[in-house]
Curated annotation (Swiss-Prot):
<feature type="modified residue" description="Phosphoserine">
    <location>
        <position position="438"/>
    </location>
</feature>
<feature type="modified residue" description="Phosphoserine">
    <location>
        <position position="881"/>
    </location>
</feature>
<dbReference type="GO" id="GO:0004672">
    <property type="term" value="F:protein kinase activity"/>
</dbReference>
<dbReference type="GO" id="GO:0000242">
    <property type="term" value="C:pericentriolar material"/>
</dbReference>
<dbReference type="GO" id="GO:0060271">
    <property type="term" value="P:cilium assembly"/>
</dbReference>
<feature type="modified residue" description="Phosphoserine">
    <location>
        <position position="418"/>
    </location>
</feature>
<feature type="binding site">
    <location>
        <begin position="10"/>
        <end position="18"/>
    </location>
    <ligand>
        <name>ATP</name>
    </ligand>
</feature>
<feature type="domain" description="Protein kinase">
    <location>
        <begin position="4"/>
        <end position="258"/>
    </location>
</feature>
<feature type="modified residue" description="Phosphoserine">
    <location>
        <position position="664"/>
    </location>
</feature>
<dbReference type="GO" id="GO:0005829">
    <property type="term" value="C:cytosol"/>
</dbReference>
<keyword id="KW-0523">Neurodegeneration</keyword>
<feature type="compositionally biased region" description="Basic and acidic residues">
    <location>
        <begin position="344"/>
        <end position="360"/>
    </location>
</feature>
<dbReference type="GO" id="GO:0005929">
    <property type="term" value="C:cilium"/>
</dbReference>
<feature type="active site" description="Proton acceptor">
    <location>
        <position position="128"/>
    </location>
</feature>
<feature type="modified residue" description="Phosphoserine">
    <location>
        <position position="868"/>
    </location>
</feature>
<dbReference type="GO" id="GO:0006468">
    <property type="term" value="P:protein phosphorylation"/>
</dbReference>
<feature type="modified residue" description="Phosphothreonine">
    <location>
        <position position="661"/>
    </location>
</feature>
Length: 1258
């Protein structure tokens, strides 16, 4: 190292450091590879020295030049030339995504291939070809370096088995741990070429496993079409998974677009040496006999003479060939001398005899031309021979590999074949001659044939030349035979011709000698090979014996270890058994106590269920009795109305469901009630849009129209009540018949009173039972008949909807002609469901509830719906069932459904939202006009308005009652009741601000926060609170219905949506007056205590009898246990698809009807806030609601405690690592029993604050 000065370390790999140094002798920079061999095993040291031997033999312009090597201080130093241009990897990265030009890529690739050819021709595998090991010199020449893991193959048949190389460049056979040879270098060459074309690795992955899978599959992104087809196809050939399918370096260089570039980088001498001398080294004397002894051959023959200067040093050419080559060399050198010697006398002759000179020059020109032609022909022959030879070599090599594989698998001992004998070839410098002989042995048969062919050609050429020369020599008598340019030997050459036979004999003798020598070599090789195989076999046998002895010792140790472990295990088991015995004794008594407690709990639950069922039955009987009484009263009123109209009550046929289902005697009495269609026809609304429009216009212009509409609604209510009585016995088919169209109802009416049908002339069509008809058939008739009519609720109580109608067909047209306000028109879609008159709903919902219970049981979950709690709350359930039936019928949001019985259903809420203000105003105006007829009249008016306005009043009632299931709905319903009592103008312009004012009113109307929360938590909420209840139940039981966006929003959180819905719902409720708040409060209480109170309130009959009935029903419902309601809710939840819950808020309808305003609002508003905040102040902002809640909590708990809990909840929610489930336990511990019930409110406040801080800037 004293000759070099270290400059810097430029790299470090697993095989050593690379240090840039400067030579003190010549001042040039070199790279020294420092390999620490002091820590290496002897084998590793040998490998390092092998690298030196390999590098010493590598002399090629495209291979990094080896200078010297030395060992010093336990390290091996290898001195190589320094490539200033850096490596190809850095050059690729410097492009920064800009692709190389194809010429540049091919120039580099050709140079890499030439270097690799030089390596492979010497039976060396590089095994670490990658862009980091390909270097660029100052002038742009590419050089292959880093032969640190190169392996000299003892023969081309031998396949290396070690898995070495950079992961990105590993070949599939290495990844699969299969044998590999030079074709693995070809794969790596393909990786480098791909990298040059795309600036990326062909195979990239995040883990070694995925990388190996990609390499084995052989799939890589295609090369850009920017490059030629030849280049792209070359890349795909290099990436063939099967090594045999990949081309060799030689075949790559034979490709036209590659071969034409070789001349740019190799001198003619090197080209001849790389592509010609390989054949010379194999065929020995073949090239020399091929050269003709003509004068024109001199230049060509001299070149081979120079190339063979040190053949043994490079290629290990057999000594016999070297001698033969030297002999020919001596023969040719004299030729040159003779030529020169004869040229000088030739000049003398020319000076003396100019004429001869002229003629001689002419003859020389002719001969030179002939020689050039002959040269060209010979070049062509040589190139053809080269191509044939390359093909033969490739074919033979593949055959050898196949043979070696077959032999190796057949016989392990002979796996190495002749390869192991050939190990000395370049493995160490001292055995060159034997190795060369061995390399030649495999080709001996072919070599002999080639030698014979070449010799034959040489003899033929000599004879040909003789004939030509003799024939040409005759006319040129003046020229001496020795002076002829065709004969470089001059006269001597002339004398040699008679000795041609001697030459042939010599050649034959040499050929025989070489054959004998080859045969002897083969025999010797076989003997040596056999000896080696035997020795190796014995060695392996000895090693196997040693391993066996070692294994026996291990087995003894393992057996002893197993015994010790088994003993320890048994001891541990015994100790555990003892401990377990003590624990069992202690736990046995506890287990008994636990089982006794479980039995007690089970018995208690059963007794509670039985009690609830009994109470449900009693309540049902009472409600039925009251419904019958109410029905009788309604029937009388209806008959009076008919008499006033000139129609006999006997002519009126009962509702459709009564004929089909029979029912109790009281229910059968109701059959005399006529259908809505017949009532409309009697009034003059002859199922035509024009009549309906006229009535709507008259309604707005005159009170007479209003009164007629109210009477129609009364009739409708009676029909609904009658239908509800029979609902208990009706099937799904009944429900569908009722909902399909009114023609079926008229058909049933025909049966009861055939005389009236004669007047109507529509009976014949209606005889067909609807359950046997397809939906399309029944629907088309429905469209014709129900366009402008008030749709009557069928016996099942499901709201009437015309499926085929678009909202614009009926309601919009009617509304457009009715000169209604825009606000009412907006709600058409939503209000469709609420057209059913509130009066009918009051009792009909009950009746329909029963029938719907049955229907629902058929349709949805018979068991869940038929539960006694459901029956007991038949009013509630009837409401729920109407909703269910509505949804069953298609959740139609069309205006035709405005009459539906959803007054208390969530659909009502939707309608309210869609008509927030107008509905209430209309409702109020109607209520103010007349109290007695109000419920019916108002309902009729509402129905008509609904058809015209899009749910004007009935929807208001329904929506008011249902808008805020626990709070706003009740308030609205109560307000509506009050309003119904106070007659007012039919329509009012309502401003949305009024809705905002309603919020505080509604909140004040609600029960105290604790009460509302208690109801919520127990899922005893009234039917109007169904939305809340369904959400709470869904959240607590994990029943998240994908059809309900509210649930989706609150899946993993408390149902925060209630806060926003309540706050935003209030404005949509409509204009509700303060004087109605009292009724709302009553209704809220009823709702909370019993699900069906709201129904009665919805119907809002001002008759004293009805009021008494209301009061009694409210009393009954207050006494109902919460369990019944929860059971009912559960049954309703089971039917979540229909979602017609008794609570009156039809969540499913809301969610199913996103097109309507109400549905959209319902998503946010349908759920009421807990009602914790009771303030009568009017709030214009959501923040006021939250601040009131905050103030209320601070006053009740104390600021410090409230702040502590608030911060605790907030911290737990903000910490992603915290389990939110733990939050409730921790917080409830802090709150204690006294304030434990406030946890939900604080949680809502935290969630709301977080939501507004993050998302809402308003």
């Amino acid at each position: 190292m004293e000759k070099y000065v270290r400059l810097q370390k430029i790299g470090e790999g697993s095989f050593g450091k690379a240090i840039l140094v400067k030579s003190t002798e010549d001042g040039r920079q070199y790279v020294i590879k420092e390999i620490n061999i002091s820590r290496m095993s002897s084998k590793e040291r040998e490998e390092s020295r092998r690298e030196v031997a390999v590098l010493a033999n590598m002399k090629h312009p495209n291979i990094v030049q080896y200078r010297e090597s030395f060992e010093e201080n336990g390290s091996l130093y290898i001195v190589m030339d320094y490539c200033e241009g850096g490596d190809l990897f850095k050059r690729i990265n410097a492009q920064k995504g800009v692709l190389f030009q194809e010429d540049q890529i091919l120039d580099w690739f050709v140079q890499i291939c030439l270097a690799l050819k030089h390596v492979h021709d010497r039976k060396i595998l590089h095994r670490d070809i990658k862009s980091q090991n390909i270097f660029l010199t100052k002038d742009g020449t590419v050089q292959l370096g880093d032969f640190g893991i190169a392996r000299v193959l003892n023969s081309t048949v031998e396949l290396a088995r070690t898995c070495i190389g950079t992961p990105y460049y590993l070949s599939p056979e290495i990844c699969e741990n299969k044998p590999y040879n030079n074709k693995s270098d070809i794969w790596a060459l393909g990786c480098v070429l791909y990298e040059l074309c795309t600036l990326k690795h062909a195979f990239e992955a995040g883990s070694m496993k995925n990388l190996v899978l990609k390499i084995i599959s052989g799939s890589f992104p295609p090369v850009s079409l920017h490059y030629s087809y030849d280049l792209r196809s070359l890349v795909s050939q290099l990436f063939k998974r099967n090594p045999r399918d990949r081309p060799s370096v030689n075949s790559i260089l034979e490709k036209g677009f590659i071969a034409k570039r070789i001349e740019k980088f190799l001198s003619p001498q090197l080209i001849a040496e790389e592509f010609c001398l390989k054949t010379f080294s194999k065929f020995g004397s073949q090239p020399i006999p091929a050269k003709r002894p003509a004068s024109g051959q001199n230049s060509i023959s001299v070149m081979p003479a120079q190339k063979i200067t040190k053949p043994a040093a490079k290629y290990g050419i057999p000594l016999a060939y070297k001698k033969y080559g030297d002999k020919k060399l001596h023969e040719k050198k004299p030729l040159q001398k003779h030529k020169q010697a004869h040229q000088t006398p030739e000049k003398r002759v020319n000076t003396g005899e100019e004429r001869r000179k002229i003629s001689e020059e002419a003859a020389r020109k002719r001969r030179l031309e002939f020689i050039e032609k002959e040269k060209k022909q010979k070049d062509q022959i040589i190139s053809l021979m080269k191509a044939e030879q390359m093909k033969r070599q490739e074919k033979e090599r593949l055959e050898r590999i196949n043979r070696a594989r077959e032999q190796g698998w057949r016989n392990v001992l002979s796996a190495g074949g002749s390869g192991e004998v050939k190990a000395p070839f370049l493995g160490s410098g001292g055995t060159i001659a034997p190795s060369s002989f061995s390399s030649r042995g495999q080709y001996e048969h072919y070599h002999a044939i080639f030698d014979q062919m070449q010799q034959q050609r040489a003899e033929d050429n000599e004879a040909k030349w003789k004939r030509e020369i003799y024939g040409r020599g005759l006319p040129e008598r003046g020229i001496l035979p020795g002076v002829r340019p065709g004969f470089p030997y001059g006269a001597a050459g002339h004398h040699h011709f008679p000795d041609a036979d001697d030459i042939r004999k010599t050649l034959k003798r040499l050929k025989a000698v070489s054959k004998q020598a080859n045969a002897n070599r083969q025999k010797g090789q076989l003997a040596v090979e056999r000896a080696k195989q035997v020795e190796e076999f014995l060695q392996r046998k000895r090693e196997a014996m040693q391993n066996k002895a070692r294994a026996e010792g291990h087995m003894v140790y393992l057996a002893r270890l197993r015994q010790i472990r088994l003993q320890n295990f048994n001891e541990r088991q015994q100790i555990k058994a003892k401990l377990r015995g003590e624990k069992k004794e202690a736990n046995h008594s506890e287990g008994q106590e636990g089982s006794e407690e479980a039995d007690m709990r089970r018995k208690k639950i059963e007794s509670l269920k039985a009690h609830a069922n009994a109470r449900a039955a009693v309540l049902k009987e009472q409600l039925e009795r009251k419904r019958k009484e109410a029905y009788e009263r309604e029937k009388k009123v209806w008959e009076e109305h008919l008499v006033a109209k000139g129609v006999k009550s006997s002519d009126v046929s009962p509702p459709l469901g009564q004929h089909e289902t029979g029912g109790s005697p009281s229910k059968q009495q109701m059959r005399s009630v006529i259908s809505v269609t017949s009532a409309l026809k009697e009034v003059g609304v002859d199922s035509s849009l024009t009549d309906t429009r006229e009535t709507s216009e008259e309604m707005q212009k005159t009170n007479n129209a209003i009164s007629s509409k109210r009477e129609i609604l009364r009739r409708l209510n009676e029909n609904l009540k009658a239908q509800e009585d029979e609902k208990g016995k009706q099937n799904l088919s009944d429900t569908f018949e009722i909902n399909v169209h009114e023609d079926a109802k008229e058909h049933e009416k025909e049966k009861s009173v055939s005389s009236d049908r004669k007047k109507w002339e529509a009976g014949g069509q209606l005889v067909i039972p609807l359950d046997e008809l397809t939906l399309d058939t029944s629907f088309s008739t429905t469209e014709r008949h129900t366009v402008g009519e008030v749709i009557k609720l069928g016996p099942n109580g499901s709201p009437r909807r015309a499926w085929g109608k678009s909202p614009t067909d009926s309601v919009l047209k009617i509304l457009g002609e009715a000169e209604l306000q825009l606000q009412t028109e907006l709600l058409e879609n939503t209000t469709i469901r609420s057209e059913i008159s509130p009066e009918g709903e009051k009792y009909k919902p009950l009746i329909t509830g029963e029938k719907k219970v049955q229907c629902i049981s058929h349709e949805i979950n018979p068991s869940a719906i038929v539960d006694s709690p459901v029956e007991t709350k038949s009013p509630e359930f009837s409401e729920a069932s109407p909703q269910m039936s509505l949804k069953l019928e298609g959740n139609l949001e069309e205006p035709d459904d405005l009459e539906t019985e959803i007054l208390q259903e969530p659909s009502g809420t939707n309608k309210d939202e869609s008509l927030p203000c107008t509905i209430t105003d209309v409702w109020i105006s109607e209520e103010k006009e007349t109290k007695e007829t109000q419920s019916a009249d108002r309902i009729t008016i509402q129905e008509n308005e609904v058809s015209e306005d899009g749910v004007s009043s009935t929807v208001d009632q329904l929506s008011d009652i249902h808008i805020e299931p626990g709070t706003n709905d009740s308030q609205h319903s109560k307000c509506d009741v009050d309003k119904s009592v106070q007659p007012e103008p039919f329509f009012h312009k309502v401003v949305h601000s009024e809705h905002l004012n309603l919020v505080p009113q509604v909140q004040s109307v609600q029960c105290s926060p604790e009460e509302s929360f208690a109801f919520r938590s127990h899922s005893h909420l009234p039917p109007k609170n169904k939305n809340k209840n369904s959400l709470l139940i869904g959240l607590s039981t994990g029943l998240f219905d994908a059809n309900n966006p509210k649930m989706l929003r609150t899946c993993s959180l408390p149902d925060l949506s209630k806060l926003f819905r309540t706050l935003m719902d209030v404005p949509t409720v409509g204009d509700v007056r303060q004087d109605n708040l009292e009724i709302d409060e009553i209704e809220d209480e009823n709702i909370k205590e019993g699900p069906s109170d709201s129904e009665d309130i919805v119907f809002e009959e001002t008759d004293t009898d009805l009021q008494e009935l209301q009061a009694s029903m409210e009393q009954l419902l207050r006494e109902q246990p919460g369990e019944e309601y929860s059971e009912e809710e559960e049954s309703v939840l089971k039917n979540s698809d229909v979602e017609p819950t008794a609570n009156g808020t039809d969540v499913a309808d809301e969610d199913d009807n996103p097109s309507s305003e109400s549905a959209l609002n319902e998503e946010w508003h349908s759920d009421n806030s807990d009602g914790e905040i009771a303030s009568e102040c009017e709030c214009d902002s959501v923040f006021n609601h939250l601040e009131e809640l905050r103030l209320h909590l601070e006053q009740e708990m104390g600021f410090e405690k409230f702040f502590e809990v608030y911060e605790k909840i907030k911290a737990i929610h903000e910490d992603e690592d915290e389990n939110i489930e733990i939050c409730s336990k921790i917080v409830q511990n802090i709150l204690g029993n006294e304030h434990q019930h406030l946890y939900a409110k604080i949680l809502h406040l935290v969630m709301a604050d977080g939501a507004y801080q993050e998302d809402n800037d308003e």
